[in-house]
Amino acid sequence: MDPPSPSRTSQTQPTATSPLTSYRWHTGGGGEKAAGGFRWGRFAGWGRALSHQEPMVSTQPAPRSIFRRVLSAPPKESRTSRLRLSKALWGRHKNPPPEPDPEPEQEAPELEPEPELEPPTPQIPEAPTPNVPVWDIGGFTLLDGKLVLLGGEEEGPRRPRVGSASSEGSIHVAMGNFRDPDRMPGKTEPETAGPNQVHNVRGLLKRLKEKKKARLEPRDGPPSALGSRESLATLSELDLGAERDVRIWPLHPSLLGEPHCFQVTWTGGSRCFSCRSAAERDRWIEDLRRQFQPTQDNVEREETWLSVWVHEAKGLPRAAAGAPGVRAELWLDGALLARTAPRAGPGQLFWAERFHFEALPPARRLSLRLRGLGPGSAVLGRVALALEELDAPRAPAAGLERWFPLLGAPAGAALRARIRARRLRVLPSERYKELAEFLTFHYARLCGALEPALPAQAKEELAAAMVRVLRATGRAQALVTDLGTAELARCGGREALLFRENTLATKAIDEYMKLVAQDYLQETLGQVVRRLCASTEDCEVDPSKCPASELPEHQARLRNSCEEVFETIIHSYDWFPAELGIVFSSWREACKERGSEVLGPRLVCASLFLRLLCPAILAPSLFGLAPDHPAPGPARTLTLIAKVIQNLANRAPFGEKEAYMGFMNSFLEEHGPAMQCFLDQVAMVDVDAAPSGYQGSGDLALQLAVLHAQLCTIFAELDQTTRDTLEPLPTILRAIEEGQPVLVSVPMRLPLPPAQVHSSLSAGEKPGFLAPRDLPKHTPLISKSQSLRSVRRSESWARPRPDEERPLRRPRPVQRTQSVPVRRPARRRQSAGPWPRPKGSLSMGPAPRARPWTRDSASLPRKPSVPWQRQMDQPQDRNQALGTHRPVNKLAELQCEVAALREEQKVLSRLVESLSTQIRALTEQQEQLRGQLQDLDSRLRAGSSEFDSEHNLTSNEGHSLKNLEHRLNEMERTQAQLRDAVQSLQLSPRTRGSWSQPQPLKAPCLNGDTT
């Protein structure tokens, strides 16, 4: 491609500077290159000051290298003629032009066709069949719009790979911000290439021809499953630059049965490629889209964001729901997107699978179809929905979830699913410049203001969008580090709360670890987790769930599995992500500065094991470690292993709550030192392996559009006070939504809220930065050695008094001649007053201490439309007396104090309310105690009366007993008298009259009886 002409370049640059042109934006057509940049850098220079100007470079860059593509350079135009690779390379070698010759005017439209103003709406291509050839992208490289097969790999379906090559852009991403020290700013990539580059090209061409010839030769053996030798030779010369309508689409793993695949389609053909990881796939998709869709970031487009949760189905016929199983398929406008795993059973069918798609073209209808697993099976039922209903304002924020009746199925058949769709309007990337700047500079302020106002789901979505945007700009690592430190300060050193709550910090850390540690999870847990999911061995150790005879065998099996998982984790330090190591090291340093060094390992443990490794073991399908949810038996095994690993990381033995796991306490004691050593290793920064600079990739405009839509939804329900503290973000969001230019600039530091300003001033802290509009709120610091006159002169906004103004000395006229005169050395004289400064001149000496002199800029709006700058343009009274700003400053301080007192009053009122609530509770408790006391008193009285009655009864019985004893004594005495009387009668002589006269007896007893 020929370089753009200077005339065209001059047309693309604006003549006057404006806030939108403070940064240099690169377009796909013919913009100029950034000075000395290796990367696509629309947002790479946000860290510098807004007024910083980049050095100008030549508008005619040198020829570019064929092996390395500068990402910050404008992409290539689509080629109209099919050029052979060898012809292009040898032509470059034989005739290296030092400067490109200008082409004739009649050939310019033919070589560089103008991009279409309204490109055709892309449609989702037809899904590939399961037996389609899938090519390993590790054997390819991207050279001049061609996917060139380097060779050395035999055809084989879905074979594992150890390493992987990458495209030119991927190589640059892996290298970080490395720059050659000998390279001057403004040189392009071919200028730094050595002379051995052509010889390397010769060797490459020779090897390509030899391998092509070897592949074309007939060989003995069975044909490959991926295709014939001719198909491989055709693919080795695939020139995508000569094709029309080249599109790149990521493929869901369920379509081909293999993860991390993408499809390249063009008019008349398509190819499928597999990658080693999701990060590698994203880099390849980005590089290919930059190559074949160069204007994607510079045009407005509409894309669809879709999330579908397929839960369960009911009411299907027994014959249909039986073996071999039923799948649920997702169709969008007649194109198959994904399918669930097969489920079989006589009752309800459970899937519980989630599908998420981004960057889909505008679509109208979504269809969920239930289909049998057998070949050529018919559709058992379907659900058809219009996406306009799901994207309507009245649609629920969490999505539409219900039982959808199945069309074409028996009555009562239904599918339970949750669907959430959103149509995004993606603007050109330069329209989001201010939004990206605000997020880059003030993400901590934004998270702190929105934290108490968001539910858990909104926090998760906002944190994911922020992490993706900042990862694309290279600032996600700083975001996670700062939020983790803030979470540590919020918890106040309480270990039980570290990373266990649903906050923006925890959600951001989860999203960042999922993005960074995908390869790490695959390398560490992928193989062992897949083996455990496929195993049929039982590891249940709960005595209530397994026989006692099998319990020792199950315990030994679980211990061996935990040993295997733990060994893979502690030996994974060699491929541990360096980005996470830097974050963990920063957290430990923050704990050390706070005097709580013990919390450093706890932070690492809570983030790495509690939020990443153990959840990946529990739910491997959510982290890409398994294609489907495990069966109940393996799921129970994974749950027990996750419990053991988590307790080992927390150094917490099993207690009475899980007494059946007590046999694993010896395992925890044995491997505790190794776990502590691993936590120390991952928190150490390896300088050689640590990444530097930009590490992100992806569609930044799309991620910014998602973030803009979420923030608009959040700010629509936010209170006005919180909005004011986040200015100018609401103004930026409103301008982007209305399609108006953003007329504000993002400061490097936002002013503190009034309460924080008062607290910082009362604590004796000096403000680091203050906006000009906030200067009247603060009294300048005055030392005791300054005189009154110097104090008056040093006042920030006071004008000099009329009596202090000195007459201006008129400059001496300068006479010029035709020749340059010899100037005599000027004598230094005492100035009688300040020189008049002409309009537009620069101040070379110390500025006077009066109000700064400024002039209007033609690039800025003369009447600011933002509310916080209108008061600065209001005319002020020129006759304002000296020191009138003092009461204003004092009033501002008093207002701050009043605001602080109001806050204290609110706190005290809340305290009084809480105390009154406690008093009411104590009063109610006292009433209850009184009632209980009365009840006890009544019961005591009743008991005492019963006791008295029983006591009276006992006294009567005693009296009766005494009477009986008395009667017994009387009877004994009477008996004794009778005995004596009988004896006396027996001894005395009887007379005649004695037999007829009886002896007199004693008086009767007291009770009236006679004896």
UniProtKB/Swiss-Prot annotation:
Main location: cytoplasm
Coiled-coil region: 888-988
Region (Disordered): 1-38, 52-136, 151-197, 209-230, 756-885, 987-1011
Keyword terms: Coiled coil, Cytoplasm, GTPase activation, Phosphoprotein
Residues at the site labelled Arginine finger: R500
TM stretches of this protein: none
Polar residues: compositionally biased ranges: 871-882, 987-999
Entries under InterPro entries matching the protein: C2_dom (IPR000008), C2_domain_sf (IPR035892), Ras_GTPase (IPR039360), RasGAP_CS (IPR023152), RasGAP_dom (IPR001936), Rho_GTPase_activation_prot (IPR008936)
GO molecular function: GTPase activator activity; identical protein binding
A Gene Ontology term for the protein's cellular component: cell cortex
The protein, known as: RAS protein activator like-3
Species per Swiss-Prot/TrEMBL record: Homo sapiens
Gene name tied to this protein: RASAL3
